[in-house]
From Swiss-Prot:
Protein name (Swiss-Prot/TrEMBL): Ribonuclease PH
GO BP, one annotated term: rRNA processing
CDD domains registered for this protein in UniProt: RNase_PH_bact (cd11362)
Lineage of source species: Bacteria, Pseudomonadati, Pseudomonadota, Alphaproteobacteria, Sphingomonadales
Binding site for phosphate: 86, 124-126
Keyword field contains Translocase: no
Organism: Sphingopyxis alaskensis (strain DSM 13593 / LMG 18877 / RB2256) (Sphingomonas alaskensis)
Length: 238
């Protein structure tokens, strides 16, 4: 039995509130159960130095957690003067995931910066960030299209992410903190709306699992991402 009482293949409730802030071109508050992330997408009419003059755009991401997003208060990374390795890893993952479904040539010489700020953490913050980030990106791009700043849609597919793991010997979908903290194995799966794999991060803790175990987690991830894709489509009116 899972601590939450959910079935092995049952997601936490998903909520995506769009236009959560008034300034960003795209913004959402995304909730997976008690995990809540504020995501904004900001359009900048410039690109990184390595892309100047190449006629293509860029999508990048930043990630952070509010000090009391967790059970005990954590110090702000700005106060420490540097980002943790975990933060750098997650924001790179978010950026890679979004770039996998964007045609940079069609975006033109502009950059869209995604900011993911975790306001409450209960497991799956990076996957919630990716899933919410796609919606914020979609909203921002829609505004560019409406303003006739883009002639073609650069977003070629949707993307979502979910965690799966082995908890007390059973493969389960969408781990919360109580499960994630003691799971024998856990993984993050990033998939596109067409079913393609963008990234898989999987590891074991104190136990191992075989190839079939990994495939069972992937099958669960496909179930979960299917629900996320439906929530994303509803949020953006598609």
């Amino acid at each position: 039995m899972r601590p939450s009482g959910r079935a092995a293949d049952q997601m936490r409730p998903i909520a995506i509130e769009t236009n959560f802030t008034i300034h960003a071109e795209g913004s959402v508050l995304v909730s997976f159960g008690n995990t809540r992330v504020l995501v904004t997408a900001s359009v900048e009419e410039k690109v990184p130095p390595f892309l100047r003059g190449k006629g293509q755009g860029w999508v990048t991401a930043e990630y952070g957690m509010l000090p009391r997003a967790t059970h005990t208060r954590g110090s702000r990374e700005a106060a420490k003067g540097k980002q943790s390795g975990r933060t750098q890893e997650i924001q790179r993952l978010i950026g890679r995931s979004l770039r996998a479904v964007v045609d940079m040539q069609k975006l033109g010489e502009r950059q869209i910066v995604i900011d993911c700020d975790v306001i409450q953490a209960d497991g799956g913050t990076r996957t919630a960030s990716i899933s919410g980030a796609w919606v914020a990106l979609r909203l921002a791009v829609d505004k560019l299209i409406e303003a006739k700043q883009l002639t073609e849609d650069p977003i070629v597919d949707s993307v979502a992410a979910i965690s799966c793991g082995i908890y007390k010997g059973t493969p389960v979908l969408d781990l919360d903190y109580d499960e994630d903290s003691v799971a024998e194995a856990d993984g993050n799966f990033v998939l596109t709306g067409k079913g393609q794999i963008v990234e898989v991060q999987a590891s074991a803790e104190g136990a191992t699992y075989d190839e079939e175990g990994l495939l069972r987690l992937l099958r669960l991830a496909r179930i979960g991402c299917g629900e996320i894709f439906a929530a994303q489509a509803k949020a953006v009116g598609r």
